[in-house]
A protein has these predicted regions:
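Short loop/turn motifs that connect adjacent beta-strands in outer-membrane beta-barrel proteins
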Residues: 27, 109-119, 184-191, 257, ...
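Conserved small-residue
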Residues: 208, 324, 414, 433-527, ...
Length: 696
């Protein structure tokens, strides 16, 4: 597998799986699952999201090579030549992951005490050992010097040979034990209950060494690097977290008609200070199978199943930065000199990076759900409907907005934030057959939206920019009203400095006669879709089978600001002085401009002009298969033999065309955002797969 013609990427995996199931006695069962895996990865020093950002942000006229074959400098005038960055010329990143998962489980039936009683316990042990080397090295890039008419090598600007050698180990050990009871009384009362205890502990440790100024890249070990203090560095980091959970559930049904369930959790986390570590989280649900009632019998030929359901539950979240109840300090490499002459010495010191909050505790989510499940005409049609509303409370946020930075305070996170989520989920299906032909369709539809109830905001924040009352990730940008057609229109309209015909017109939201960031507005829309849907079509006939899956979204927007390597869509239909007045009046884009970071402060700003409807319907997958007749395969000892061809991401119906409407923020290997422009995101891949399945 590769998506680059010449690249440094390579991946190998070796895996060993063992599953042992043993029935020791009539009442005792034991299982042991073992998974061992080694991953050997090799790539260049630049991750794929970064590479695609550079591919798509290179100036159109900046070819990677000169006509004589010499690699040229990138658009920054130094090193960013994406055609070289995919190779191992700038260096390599080689690492190995050794993964071991072990899960022994013991189940004991305790029917000799009372029927339906059992005990069960398991241990899940997950270990990962990783080590790797990242090597950076200088490489040849050239630029043409018009003065000397010679190609100048910029190798000296691409860095020195350096090595980062690291090793990491982390483990998660989980112990789980439960006592359960499952029994039916008089064929009408069904009870299923258990109480359980679980504890888990996570440990992480990494150690790294850095050296530079190697004489060559022949021997890349730490001892071969420079011994000058400025050319070397060592580092290490450890982390640990743990949880203890007591939980239980009681499920009861009467004649499979009246259903009730109660779940309780009592969870403790070391992420919180003593006195705030424990949280009690209950949940309740009720169900009524109305179709089992006698009064329902007249409609049973049409509605064979109808169940009403309702639930309420509370969940806790401790997935936060650990030890926020402790103050955090960092050691700086700078400080004050004390003494004079040869006796002067640099005294390094600590500085506060986080103030302790001893009251930090669980974030909570209270969720209410109402719905029904139904099937019609002996299962030919089925329908599931759920309405939900979730109130997230005690979300950790800081008061950094309402307390100005000049206060000098390093503020802690506090359990202050409030967000509401609500929506509906619908799943419907239809199936039928005629002779040897079977077919069916299943569709799902989800509408969900969120609204910030409370978020700390500066008092001076304009009402039209506030987060409160809007989605969490609502976009803030200028509202574009059109394109300036004449200098007279510019002079009579609030505008930024140096605005001219062909530039975008922005709304003066606060009415002060000037355009500043205070005029930007917060939208009730974002790249997160409010509507997600999909449907699957399937059918089979005499060994042939077909499965088609469509996926889509709606009520989402994508910001597609132009970048340096503007796609053709941004070029065609733009405002130009050479156009007729009618052409400019209907221009799709403002006049050509230099990107904001290179001088433009007007057209390149985030605005509704660059906002596009991100709704789409995608043919996500199609699979066609054929199963050979059993009469043929049984003669050669094969129980079932199927051939198939599968296609993924085959085509998409959308109005964007500029980029994939589903992409959002590109992220690097560590999950940090690289850009929020859909044009620069890693594209989806269309894949065609041929295969066969053989069962003996």
């Amino acid at each position: 597998d590769a998506i680059y013609r010449n690249s440094a990427q390579d991946y190998k995996q070796f895996q060993l799986v063992s599953n042992l199931d043993a029935k020791i006695s009539k009442s005792v069962r034991f299982s042991l699952d073992i998974l061992g895996r080694q991953e050997q990865r090799k790539r260049g020093i630049y991750s794929t999201p970064y590479l695609f950002t550079y591919f798509l942000s290179t100036f159109p006229g900046s070819a990677p090579y000169y006509p004589n074959g010499l690699p040229r400098v990138g658009y920054d005038g130094i090193t960013r030549n994406a055609a070289i960055m995919v190779t191992d010329l700038p260096g390599s990143n080689n690492y190995t992951n050794n993964i071991l998962n072990i899960k022994p489980l013991l189940h004991i039936d305790l029917d000799f005490i009372t029927e339906g009683l059992y005990a069960e316990g398991y241990a899940a042990i997950d270990y990962t050992f990783s080590d790797g080397k990242q090597i950076n090295q200088p490489y040849d890039l050239y630029y043409y010097d018009n003065a000397t008419q010679e190609y100048q090598n910029k190798r000296s600007d691409t860095g020195q040979i350096s090595l980062n050698d690291w090793a990491t180990r982390y483990s998660t050990i989980t112990l789980n034990g439960r006592i359960g009871y499952e029994r039916t009384f008089n064929d009408v009362h069904k009870v299923n209950a258990f109480v359980a205890y679980e504890q888990s502990k996570y440990n992480y440790h990494t150690l790294s060494g850095y050296r530079t100024n190697f004489l060559s890249n022949t021997l890349m070990d730490l001892f071969a690097g420079s011994d000058v203090p400025a050319d070397k560095d060592n580092g290490g980091y450890s982390d640990a977290t743990a949880r203890v959970n007591f939980f239980g559930r009681v499920n009861y049904s009467y004649k499979d008609k009246y259903l009730a369930e109660v779940t309780m959790r009592y969870d403790g986390s070391m992420n919180f200070a003593p006195g705030h570590r424990w949280g009690l989280f209950p949940s309740f649900s009720l169900g009524w199978v109305m179709s089992e009632e006698k009064f329902f019998e007249p409609v049973k030929p049409y509605v064979d199943f109808l169940k009403l359901k309702a639930s309420w539950g509370q969940m806790g979240n401790d997935n936060i930065s650990a030890y926020q109840y402790l103050s955090q300090y960092a050691f700086t490499g700078t400080g004050a000199y004390f003494g004079s002459g040869d006796g002067a010495a640099l005294n390094k010191g600590f500085y506060l990076t986080r103030t302790a909050n001893p009251l930090v505790t669980w974030e909570t989510a209270n969720t209410t759900n109402l719905g029904f499940s139904a099937s019609f005409l002996n299962g030919m049609f089925s329908l599931d409907f759920d309405w939900f509303k979730s109130k997230r409370r005690d979300i950790l946020i800081t008061r950094s907005a309402s307390i100005p930075t000049y206060s000098g305070l390093v503020l802690p996170a506090e359990n202050l934030g409030k967000v509401n989520n609500s929506g509906v989920e619908i799943v419907a299906s239809y199936r039928d057959r005629a002779g040897d032909f079977e077919w069916g369709i299943t569709g799902n539809f989800t509408y969900a939206e969120n609204k910030v109830v409370y978020m700390d905001e500066a008092v001076a924040t304009p009402e039209w920019q506030r987060t409160t009352g809007n989605p969490i990730d609502g976009l803030v940008l200028y509202k574009a009203l059109g394109i300036y057609q004449s200098q007279e229109q510019v002079d009579n309209t609030p505008h930024m400095d140096n605005a001219a015909p062909g530039d975008l017109i922005y709304q003066d939201t606060n009415g002060d006669g000037t355009i500043t960031w205070d005029d930007a507005i917060r939208l009730n829309e974002s790249a997160t879709p409010k509507i997600v849907y999909g449907f699957t079509l399937n059918g089979s006939w005499k060994g042939l089978d077909l499965n088609v899956f469509f996926q889509g979204q709606a009520k989402a927007v994508q910001l597609v600001q132009p970048t340096m390597n503007m796609v053709t869509d941004f070029y065609e239909g733009r405002w130009r002085t050479e156009n007729t007045p009618e052409e400019n009046l209907n221009a799709r884009w403002p006049k050509a401009f230099i990107k904001q970071t290179y001088g433009d402060t007007w057209n390149g700003s985030a605005s509704t002009w660059w906002l596009r409807n991100a709704a789409f319907l995608r043919l996500k997958s199609v699979e066609i298969g054929y199963t050979l007749p059993k009469a043929w395969t049984s003669k050669i000892g094969i129980q079932r033999w199927r051939f198939y061809v599968n296609g993924n991401n085959l085509f998409t119906f959308d109005k964007m065309k500029i980029c994939d409407p589903e992409v959002g923020t590109s992220k690097d290997d560590n999950g940090y955002a690289i850009n929020s422009n859909g044009i620069l995101a890693y594209p989806l891949q269309r894949m065609i797969t041929f295969g066969t399945n053989i069962t003996f």
